[in-house]
A protein has these predicted regions:
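Core hydrophobic alpha-helical transmembrane segments of single-pass membrane proteins
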Residues: 2-12
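Short, flexible active-site loop motifs that bind/organize anionic cofactors or intermediates
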Residues: 1-3, 47, 66
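C-terminal-biased regions
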Residues: 10-62, 77-193
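Short helix-adjacent coil turns
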Residues: 64-76
Length: 193
């Protein structure tokens, strides 16, 4: 989906503005940009290149984005039903993710949840784990510390998280909002807070 790729590319372009000077990303290294400042840091690499994702992950992201952009949460049902397993949407078992999202949403329609999905997917991502535990996770904040964010990373955090929650998260140093995980084989594993 060109829209999702453009959304991700646009978000990546915002990250490359540093100290008031525009710095164009190098396409050969953009996928390996990292928030880790020190060599040897175990912080996962932050990635922005949609095209660097495995094809099954891209397909799942496109399906999620298309359903979310519709504004109709029921359009997410075929995406959920086509998935190999029901993605985790809460720490406790949930039979019907759509009903759960409607119940948890501000207006009962789930549109704010769909918006959160799109916001999360517009940020950078990280690849975590290895083998059967490998996962692509959005936003990268879910897997990195928040205590040493650059100004551009703080702006990206504010785009994903309501400001009052972002401030509290920065104080604690831990991300505590929506995160989305897809395995390399395209199986959507979670979208939860």
């Amino acid at each position: 989906m060109i829209g999702l790729a453009a959304l991700v590319a646009g978000a990546a372009a915002l990250v490359y503005v540093q100290n008031g000077a525009e710095k164009a990303p190098n396409p050969t290294t953009a996928a390996t940009e990292t928030v880790a400042a020190a060599a040897g840091d175990q912080t996962p690499k932050v990635l922005y290149d949609f095209n660097a994702l495995p094809d099954p992950v891209k397909r799942m992201l496109e399906q999620i984005a298309e359903a979310a952009q519709s504004g109709e949460i029921e359009k997410m049902r075929p995406v959920l039903e086509s998935n190999e397993l029901k993605p985790m949407v809460a720490t406790a078992h949930v039979d019907d993710p759509i009903a759960f999202w409607k119940k948890e949403s501000a207006d009962g329609s789930g549109r704010d949840v769909l918006a959160a999905m799109l916001d999360v997917m517009s940020s950078g991502y990280v690849r975590t784990g290895q083998g059967e535990d490998e996962m692509y996770v959005w936003p990268y904040f879910a897997e990195t510390g928040l205590s040493a964010l650059t100004p551009s990373q703080e702006v990206e955090l504010y785009r994903v998280v309501p400001p009052e929650r972002a401030v509290a998260m920065k104080r604690s140093g831990k991300y505590g909002y929506y995160r989305l995980g897809i395995a390399p084989n395209g199986v959507w594993h979670f979208f939860l807070q």
